[in-house]
Amino acid sequence: MGEAGAGAGASGGPEASPEAEVVKLLPFLAPGARADLQAAAVRHVLALTGCGPGRALLAGQAALLQALMELAPASAPARDAARALVNLAADPGLHETLLAADPGLPARLMGRALDPQWPWAEEAAAALANLSREPAPCAALMAALAAAEPADSGLERLVRALCTPGYNARAPLHYLAPLLSNLSQRPAARAFLLDPDRCVVQRLLPLTQYPDSSVRRGGVVGTLRNCCFEHRHHEWLLGPEVDILPFLLLPLAGPEDFSEEEMERLPVDLQYLPPDKQREPDADIRKMLVEAIMLLTATAPGRQQVRDQGAYLILRELHSWEPEPDVRTACEKLIQVLIGDEPERGMENLLEVQVPEDVEQQLQQLDCREQEQLERELAPEPWVERATPT
């Protein structure tokens, strides 16, 4: 990589170690360095993040990580530096090393992601979305958010940025949604999201239909699904204050023409949909929507509310249309819950049922056999694997 200038001064004498070569880049990354040399140095760093050994080499370099964060925002090197951090954070095996080298990295990335003037805020959000998939970095990020001013918490700022069109005119901030989904795996984040006085869930619901980004839709649906694990909030989620179910069902609905009797059983927002109504195109998002509804059926009152709002009708048509076997299987399980008999007394809350160890093992074996069957069904088809953004 001659263009990066990384080998300058390396000719003659014993060959320098890779770590020493990386250290030589630091003067070119400092504020005030010649623009062309700075750009070449950052391009070299970005190239190194394209392979495992390169990422491992960079992850432990605290000074280099800090230098990447401090590049001037308007420069092209800052863009490449932000992308290098996205690639570093995409490697779960390096998260511990990254945090050890730079414990303040999550907080600084969050500051960049939520700065409405920062041009590379989307890259900062993507790096955080990658980093927060693992428990330790996620906990560090939650601590950084909790350290924000009580009147304007970090989570509130995150939700506001996600839900405000044009919050940053130069960055779409779609990756704030998967970041929020990762954070919502933690009880403290769910407590914030489900606080009735904050109206956070209500602000997120319209984004389940966001047309311009599957990343944003998927992150929001993942967040809502995680909130549905809190069965003590199901009555509130399904009730008139939130009315979550139509927002989960609408992306699963197609252009089917129901009878008048069936139409009356559906929520108003799902009645008389246009003939060009399209279902959610992403199979992973469809599966999360089905899983969220399944969680809402964990209690007897929840099951009754889901039944009363005609969910079975939407799921019946989804099952007939669904091309993906794993989504179809999830749909079948939910339909069985809705049309099956109620559990015996004392077993009404499915999330609190204690499953004997031998039964749990049998269920795991059944799941394995189910997965093998799905793989056999898929085998003859020449599926093209979708690229996953880093």
Swiss-Prot record:
UniProt key word Acetylation: yes
Modification type Phosphothreonine: residues: 388
Record keywords: Acetylation, Phosphoprotein
SUPFAM superfamilies per record: ARM repeat (SSF48371)
Pfam families, per database record: DUF383 (PF04063), DUF384 (PF04064)
The keyword Phosphoprotein appears for this protein: yes
InterPro entries the record matches: ARM-like, ARM-type_fold, Hgh1, Protein_HGH1_C, Protein_HGH1_N
Region of interest called Disordered, as start-end residue ranges on this chain: 371-390
Modified residues (N-acetylglycine): 2
Modified residues (Phosphoserine): 17, 214
Family (UniProt): Belongs to the HGH1 family.
Annotated PANTHER family: PROTEIN HGH1 HOMOLOG
Name of this protein: Protein HGH1 homolog
Source organism per UniProt: Homo sapiens (Human)
Organism phylogeny: Eukaryota, Metazoa, Chordata, Craniata, Vertebrata
